[in-house]
């Protein structure tokens, strides 16, 4: 990957293609996820996109994708080589009509 993106006023340099992880722990088991993520890193990627809500629709897998990503990061021991992006504020699966945009919700996510 080329054309990395430098974030002004920081030391962050992002690969121009991020890697979405909604399937981590679902379509990919841990072994597959680790292999896929390593391939992405070996190709020059460093931006991992995740969210607390990923996999919540498969009980009891609350937060499964984030746990798989966390296990992989711990396994490889190079957390600061990566830029982790996440999202918050998504409604809970059983209460989709209730907003989760409070400060507390953002901190929780």
Describe every region a protein language model picked out.
Residues 1-83:
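N-terminal binding-site loop/beta-alpha segment at the start of enzyme catalytic domains
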Residues 54-58, 91-97:
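A short acidic, helix-capping loop that chelates divalent metal ions and anchors anionic groups
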Residues 68-72, 87, 105-109:
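Generic beta-strand or strand-like secondary-structure segments
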Residues 80-92:
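A short, structured active-site edge motif that brings together acidic residues
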Residues 95-109:
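Glycine/proline-rich, positively charged
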